[in-house]
Amino acid sequence: MEKQTYSYEEAYEESLRYFQGDELAARVWVNKYAVKDSFGNIYEKSPKDMHWRIANEVARIEAKYSNPLSAEELFDLLDHFKYIVPQGSPMTGIGNNYQVASLSNCFVIGVDGEADSYGAIFKIDEEQVQLMKRRGGVGHDLSHIRPKGSPVKNSALTSTGLVPFMERYSNSTREVAQDGRRGALMLSVSIKHPDSEAFIDAKMTEGKVTGANVSVKLDDAFMTAAITGTPYIQQYPVNAAEPTVQKEINATNLWKKIVHNAWKSAEPGVLFWDTILKESVPDCYADLGYRTVSTNPCGEIPLCPYDSCRLLAINLYSYVANPFKPDAYFDFELFQKHIALAQRIMDDIIDLELEKIERIMEKIDADPESEDVKHTERILWDKIYKKSGQGRRTGVGITAEGDMLAALGLRYGTEEATEFSEKVHKTVALSAYRSSVEMAKERGAFEIYDTEREKNNPFINRLREADPQLYEDMKKYGRRNIACLTIAPTGTTSLMTQTTSGIEPVFLPVYKRRRKVNPNDTNVHIDFVDDTGDAFEEYIVFHPKFITWMETQGYDPTKRYTQDEIDALVERSPYYKATSNDVDWLMKVKMQGRIQKWVDHSISVTINLPNDVDEDLVNRLYVEAWKSGCKGCTVYRDGSRSGVLISAKNDKKEEMPPCKPPTVVETRPTILDADIVRFQNNKEKWVAFVGLLDGHPYEIFTGLQDDDEGIILPKNVTSGHIIKKVDKDGSKRYDFQFQNKRGYKVTIEGLSEKFNKEYWNYAKLISGVLRYRMPIEQVIKLVGSLQLDSESINTWKNGVERALKKYITDGTEAKGKKCPNCGNETLVYQEGCLICTTCGASRCG
């Protein structure tokens, strides 16, 4: 029986109803989480379908164990993102048989033992790419690479150091498409490595290492030396008792460089490595393969090589009874029950992940390539499979901390609010670990559990002190999971829960958006006209839970308020002085440190700072983070990623050469390279052929893809050539040629004859402006402005826009467009997606 499919418009409209008119939440869900096949067919109409998909799959695993949860019970926990929210890959992948992909959000890779050869470096590069193509973020450490100038036994004679390999790994990341997005990569290095200063400076040159986040691993000895002004010894290998390279450095100067670069460009992040290792429960098993070496791309999961983690968030706001009212309270009884169930669901998801990895390995085995070609990928997944099953690591976290506090009448960043947050996270830790012990009774402990190994771990001893009976039960029965907790960023997740993100405060309770309007419509109010003459109406957008506050106070959220009235409303609300730019930054760092004591992995937090803060504040924040027991810290100074980053070796800005008009090639070459882009036009499968000249779009053809009158094209074909042919009678035609799997050339003749004439004429118009090198973003704007009557033509138009977006130069400003999340005009194109440089929100498609 063929499964029902939906058009984008059908799924969007149904999701819009589901999210009660929240356009951004609806688009995020359809674009990122609705199940689709490789042709773009959509198989889910709203998040309700998705939640049943997840509930049914988890219930299937539950049935293997005693006291199973039913699909109905699970659905009630998931429905409307109210209580338990699987994040990212689990939300997309559970029960999704249209992709052969992992359910893990993140991985760390590495090489055991000596790993400073080209072979080891390139092996990690291949492993990184293989994981990213399966939708995983990847982290790895570079401390194993020999410092620059070290002798090597090859034709180079001396090592190039680690910076060139940073660029290599970064480029590999950018090459890998994950559902239209680039991969996510974390590169780390120990401050003890002699090349760590070059690592810290690597991203200060414009355009370098743009495909990776970078973090430096700081030990306590370095932090002490930096603060006291004493020397610090770097060495290689970094952990060797008898290093081959040693040098003494001024720790204070290197610390100042870290602070300056973070102030200037938001990187590097800092990882307080001794704190991470000392607090890590998995590192009690370091000699059994669980030695932590790096973190995932956002920094919330420190991992050993070939381990992975899946993420889930608890919506804290939903446990506030009578929110924003004088009698509001937090329902700890329901909360404890749901944390236990969340830990159980996460353990079920490990079983689902093991099934997914088995399917990946079956596909690798069945692929026609030789065993030599497949060897690295096959061994990689085998290692991940074993590590996932052995440790059964989970990542139970939270979201909506800011809204929870506001709903209880507590102001984020105050001592009272921080004290309450600490109580909540202590409850999470005790409930999750108690659940893991209960599962050990029913399902068995993770196979290498050993109470004796963990007896001196500070985190385990905190649990022991808070709940002695829990510790005694853990000694008796073991624990199901080697580690359980994290706090991850919940960007798109929080858009769908319609709450604040992670443990962050609200970004803004009120902001403005613009929508394009017809200037001749007497029912609209024109607030802004851009430089092309398009008219826009501005409208106020309230943070969803700010609307709830307004309604409890008797204010009408549909009324058109003046700016003074809005300011007065915010001042009366619990969100006043509690936004990301308002909170006391040092208090926020201390709050992170206090919560970290109840999180066995780590916490991903960004401290948002206004543009005018000085470097000394960044210095004080980083030092306070170390002293407070944070495992890592990242700052973002408003606007610090825009503009030109100057190389550390040259503070003088180069003068830009005079602008030259783009080269126009009026006579079309006989053969052009071409990319294939598939899209939906209503319920029909269409294909676009984008002809390229020197990598730039030169022409576009589109047509129906079917077996009768349309185009027959294997789904694995993504590129080829468009060939212009002139027949003896002078008539012209365009053919498409590609190479099939067996290496033979296949030609599809007469593209123009296969297209509807109306579409053909519009495509000729678009090709004309492409040929004369109109900037791609302006071509897309032109296509979007076409006023067409036919619904089919309009959906075709959307497909053409999506096909062309991938060719916009990264970093191009989206002029005249505001971020729908924070309201700032700071959107840039990145890999065909719109990225906000202020708040980090993204939108693809």
Specify the residue positions occupied by each region the protein language model found:
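Terminal amphipathic helices with adjacent charged low-complexity linkers/tails
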Residues: 218, 279, 284-286, 296, ...
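Catalytic alpha/beta core of large soluble enzyme barrels
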Residues: 23, 299-301, 353-354, 460, ...
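Short, Gly/Pro- and small/polar-rich lid/capping loops
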Residues: 471-473, 647-692
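Short, cysteine/histidine-rich loop/knuckle motifs that typically chelate Zn2+
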Residues: 820-824, 838
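Cysteine-rich micro-motifs
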Residues: 832-842
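Internal maturation/activation junctions in enzymes
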Residues: 74-75, 236-238, 338-385, 389, ...
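Function-dense linear segments that define catalytic or interfacial modules
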Residues: 57-64, 77-154, 162-165, 176-179, ...
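Conserved, charged catalytic cores of large soluble enzymes
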Residues: 2-68, 72, 154-168, 178-290, ...
